[in-house]
Swiss-Prot record:
SUPFAM superfamilies: alpha/beta-Hydrolases. GO terms for cellular component: cytosol. This is UPF0227 protein YcfP. One of its GO terms (molecular function) is hydrolase activity, acting on ester bonds. Belongs to the UPF0227 family.
Amino acid sequence: MIIYLHGFDSNSPGNHEKVLQLQFIDPDVRLVSYSTRHPKHDMQHLLKEVDKMLQLNVDERPLICGVGLGGYWAERIGFLCDIRQVVFNPNLFPYENMEGKIDRPEEYADIATKCVTNFREKNRDRCLVILSRHDEALDSQRSAQALHPFYEIVWDEEQTHKFKNISPHLQRIKAFKTLG
């Protein structure tokens, strides 16, 4: 089972395309939708939905995957639910760059301070990070600096922030999922 978390643009047709691409790894791909506008509510909702899926799951090696803001959530929810994560261009600093787009961006900073201390150290090697060199929305070098001490970083030379085509990375994701 692969759980897919969309980014800030929840209505993007690219979400459906990514789900279809992920089905080449595992036919059981589940999209979990969330508001993107209310961080604390989103965290509760995502934890509840992912936990429910895991309770009914038969896959011994489930995976959670997210793009952009979905990558922010996939890393945290995956850690809290003890499943491996794959994140594409994760938005690591939404409290800085979501101002004016969501109701309370400061809630992201609050969530970060309430999360498990040094959670990335405790999550070491359980997250695969795929970053675009042509991310027009986020500073991928800053993301790499924050994540490289803990996770493997894969660089993509073609895609932009929304990562429309993930197919060149499917074999790597499949191998990472298999490690479970």
